A protein has these predicted regions:
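Conserved core of the sugar-phosphate nucleotidyltransferase
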Residues: 2-84, 97
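Left-handed beta-helix
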Residues: 64-73, 88-293
Length: 293
């Protein structure tokens, strides 16, 4: 999003508050902040994570001029959690006793006191507030047909400099993946995956449809006494990962197999958990050698 468009819309409408919004489906609406617009495009009602019953009075499609082109399968308007406030209005809103949550407190209370408008954003946006949504949004980036790319020369994306060396590959097979700097990958197979900074992947590993968030530091291979019985930082030899989120500084021991072949939807295990069928190894988590999930 070009935030200048949002700010310009806020000024042009003489709004006190402007909320960036996108149309969503019935299935997605119950997990988001849903708003209803009046015929002038001003927000008339707002419900944070509404029930199915509350959604009955919230569809916007067909009721507001200029929004007739909304997809028929996405009749609800959802807040993107991106706001523009006029300065004095913001100070007044946050001065309310106990008002700390924009979706549940500040925005609903402001509707009767201020001009609160919506700004429809038609570009790519994804809510990554659940494990499945976070996973899908990341793996999607590895597709050649992805609706969003970090490599658009008109809108380049930057991260803060870390001054790491380039990723190093030794006799690897990598397809449709994003590999970040400072990674060291030895004789591994990687497809449709994201590999974060400073990731170590050892010989014989096979990684598919997974998101590895990398590490905050390097660890020497001869550092075994310091780590005790834990495997080395990163992914061990002959590990198989499929549909896995591996958080920062996690360790997966040699020969472990994390594939969720039974298709478990929700579970908690030793060093991991499963949500929406996705295996998650949390930050600093440890999977012992030979573990099968």
């Amino acid at each position: 999003m070009d935030y200048l468009d949002l700010v310009d819309a806020h000024i042009d409408r003489r709004a006190d508050i402007t909320i960036a919004v996108q149309p969503v489906s019935l299935e997605d609406a119950s997990g988001m902040g849903i708003l209803r617009l009046d015929r002038d495009g001003q927000i008339a009602a707002f419900e944070e994570k509404p029930t199915r019953e509350q959604l009955g009075g919230m569809p916007t499609r067909g009721q507001t001029p200029g929004l007739a082109a909304m997809p028929p399968d996405k009749p609800f308007m959802a807040s993107m959690g991106i706001y523009v406030f006029s300065r004095d209005v913001l100070l007044d809103c946050i001065a309310q006793d106990g008002a700390t949550d924009f979706g549940k407190q500040i925005i609903p209370h402001a509707l009767s006191r201020y001009r609160v408008h919506a700004h429809l954003f038609r570009g790519y946006w994804a809510d990554v507030g659940t494990v499945r949504a976070f996973y899908d949004a990341n793996v999607m980036l590895t597709s050649a047909a992805a609706p969003f790319t970090f490599y658009d020369p008109r809108r380049p994306m930057y991260t803060h400099p870390r001054f790491l060396p380039g990723a190093r590959f030794n006799d690897c097979a990598v397809r449709d993946s994003i590999i970040n700097e400072g990674s060291h990958i030895d004789r591994a197979r990687i497809e449709h995956s994201i590999v974060g900074i400073r990731t170590t992947i050892r010989s014989g590993a096979s990684i598919s449809r997974s998101v590895l968030l990398g590490a905050d530091y390097y660890e020497a291979d001869d550092n075994a006494p310091a780590r005790g019985n834990n495997p080395g930082l990163g992914v061990g030899s002959n590990v198989v990962l499929d549909r896995v989120i591996m958080d920062k500084n996690a360790r997966i021991g040699d020969g472990a197999r994390l594939t969720n072949e039974p298709g478990v939807d929700h579970a908690d295990g030793d060093g991991y958990y499963i949500r929406d069928g996705i295996i998650v190894v949390p930050k600093d988590g440890v999977i012992q050698p030979g573990t099968i999930v």
